Amino acid sequence: MRILILNPPHPAIGSRIPKEQLPPLGLLSIGGPLLDAGHDVTLLDAEFGPLTDSEIVERVCAHCPQLLLIGHSGSTSAHPIVCRLTLFLRERLPNLIIVYGGVFPTYHFHDILTKEPQIDFIVRGEGEATVAKLIAALENHNDLNKVDGIAFRRDEQIIETLPAPMIQDLDVYRVGWELVDLKKYSYYGGKQAVVIQFSRGCPHLCNYCGQRGFWARWRHRDPKKFAQEIVWLHRTHGVQLFNLADENPTVNKAIWQEFCEAIIAENISITIIGSTRADDIVRDADILHLYRRAGVERFLLGMENTNEATLKHIRKGSKTSTDREAIRLLRQHNILSLATWVTDFEEVRDRDFIQALKQLLYYDPDQIMSLYVTPHRWTSFYGIASERRVIQLDQTKWDYKHQVLAATHMPPWRIFLWVKLIEILLQTRPKALWRLLFQPNKASRRGMYWFTLMGRRVLVHELINFFFGDRRVKNGPTLQEFWGMPQEHQEIPLSITRK
């Protein structure tokens, strides 16, 4: 079958501000098995440019695919763009089969199939096996009810098949790297870069996380095979930077150590950045030198909040003392720390921001990223926040960088100014400037320069958009009225029983 995979353009700050793009790992992961099954597969990455709607439609029509696969890693905020593009494509290509996948459609499939008649199928959960089975069923005119992990319409009824089995062995399906020109992708200040995934899922129980349930359970690739893929990408394609897509790659100390040692044995000079938990860093204090020798240059630490009571409320499972010790240990081993701090979990006041500033200064991270809580209805936090008022009705702004919920005691502008003030104070304090200017490690210094430059661009962009661009409502619907009933009981879309 002639298949086109479309990565739609995204207006989010992370997509537009850096002026660099990373390859769409999720779509490439779907493409690999389709290529191996003998299909004619092409990927159109509309993030470059970005392409306009008309340019995308013309390119898709010129290719004239039989089937279109569409999805985006920022699936909640990208959904309106997907709907708009597929509507245009349906008008031009009435016989095109349109298949939509990702985290957001996995949970909102009923709403989407009700409101968006141009979309034919939705893939729920992991797509590597499911998409290939769906296409085989379409080609052979088999019963679609027997394809696990999909949703579709039949006789004006929405059909949801059984959950697809969770992929037990992540090395079974390969990434279709040949679908893109890897030399076009860069990150972190011009380094040729890819997104790559060692593990899926997370064993922790944070009640606001929209990813944990989607992956069902934490699983990892074979550490030696994963290392060999990195070596191949570096030596064959010149990839310098590897951005880990994992929620938590360091869950298993022995497995992660095996990966680090496999990379070290290859004697290659690469940069690895990603996310992990502070308690893993503290646990691994005796092997952090292996992290650095393997190329780990920066880890994002999801601290989420500086208040112990809030951390307990959201089931983060960490302590502020552990967070600070993790940052200290990373610095001791010349690994940069990027601390994420999320506000608006609960009703906030000025004193909460003052306390947050004091605590973040105490943490002393190299870099900081402030986010706003963004509830998903398949998480248990959604039920907690369901009666809060929504102030942002534009779904493209539900990207963690925009306020979406009203606060009783503070207007949005004051929350915004507090968040920006904290960022500025953290990044311009003498200690931070000294590290920026006199960072002894050349590679780390370059990374800090790049992050600082991006921070300046983001600050200007956010100030202009908050006061002159974004539109908020004062008496919006409740969260439940906006998104619908909670789906906590459907948080895990995969079958975890071995077949």
From Swiss-Prot:
SUPFAM superfamilies: Radical SAM enzymes
Cofactor note: Binds 1 [4Fe-4S] cluster.
Binding residues annotated for [4Fe-4S] cluster, in chain numbering: C202, C206, C209
A GO molecular-function descriptor: cobalamin binding
Keyword set, alphabetical order: 4Fe-4S, Chlorophyll biosynthesis, Cobalamin, Cobalt, Iron, Iron-sulfur, Metal-binding, Oxidoreductase, Photosynthesis, S-adenosyl-L-methionine
Keyword Glycoprotein: no
Residue ranges occupied by any B12-binding domain in the UniProt entry: 9-145
A Pfam family: Radical_SAM
E.C. no: 1.21.98.3
Domain Radical SAM core: 188-420
Catalytic activity line of the entry: Mg-protoporphyrin IX 13-monomethyl ester + 3 S-adenosyl-L-methionine + H2O = 3,8-divinyl protochlorophyllide a + 3 5'-deoxyadenosine + 3 L-methionine + 4 H(+)
InterPro entries: Aldolase_TIM, Cobalamin-bd, Elp3/MiaA/NifB-like_rSAM, Methyltransferase_Class_B, rSAM, Tetrapyrrole_Bchl_Biosynth_MTs
Gene3D superfamilies: Aldolase class I, Cobalamin-binding domain
Known pathway: Porphyrin-containing compound metabolism; bacteriochlorophyll biosynthesis (light-independent)
Annotated PROSITE patterns: B12_BINDING, RADICAL_SAM
Cofactor(s) named in the record: [4Fe-4S] cluster; adenosylcob(III)alamin
Transmembrane segments: none
GO biological process, alphabetically ordered: light-independent bacteriochlorophyll biosynthetic process; photosynthesis
Family statement drawn from the similarity comment of this UniProt entry: Belongs to the BchE family.
Entry function: Involved in the tetrapyrrole biosynthetic pathways leading to chlorophyll and bacteriochlorophyll (BChl). Catalyzes the anaerobic formation of the isocyclic ring (E-ring) in Mg-protoporphyrin monomethyl ester (MPE) to yield protochlorophyllide a (PChlide a) via a six-electron oxidation and the formation of an oxo group at position C13 using oxygen from a water molecule.
Protein known as: Anaerobic magnesium-protoporphyrin IX monomethyl ester cyclase
